[in-house]
């Protein structure tokens, strides 16, 4: 496993607040997730980095208020799971990213 030589800034504190980061490695790709807070709303962000390049970055949550996301790389798939509050209920959701495609949000 390579040692990371330099710190990298992944979010812009003037644009959004970020907490509860997660990281998973798959080959040379680095997958990240974090809880983003913008305009009084928490959402789940996911990102793929290759070296200094941002391959993609997007919101992957289901519209509710997100809490404590986790991430796992296994068998060529990247799995994200999180708690989400919507319509006066908490639920646990999951979503898979594999071969450049996103699966549906699972409950």
Predicted regions and their residues:
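Extracellular, repeat-based ectodomains that mediate carbohydrate processing or recognition
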Residues: 1-107
């Amino acid at each position: 496993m390579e040692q990371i030589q330099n710190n990298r800034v992944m979010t812009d504190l003037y644009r959004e607040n970020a907490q509860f980061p997660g990281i998973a490695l798959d080959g040379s790709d680095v997958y990240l997730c974090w809880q983003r807070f913008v305009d009084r709303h928490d959402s789940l962000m996911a990102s793929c980095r290759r070296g200094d390049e941002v391959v993609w970055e997007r919101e992957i949550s289901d519209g509710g208020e997100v809490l404590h996301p986790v991430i796992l790389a296994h068998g060529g798939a990247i799995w994200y799971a999180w708690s989400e509050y919507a319509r006066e209920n908490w639920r646990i959701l999951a979503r898979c990213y594999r071969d450049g495609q996103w699966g549906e949000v699972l409950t």
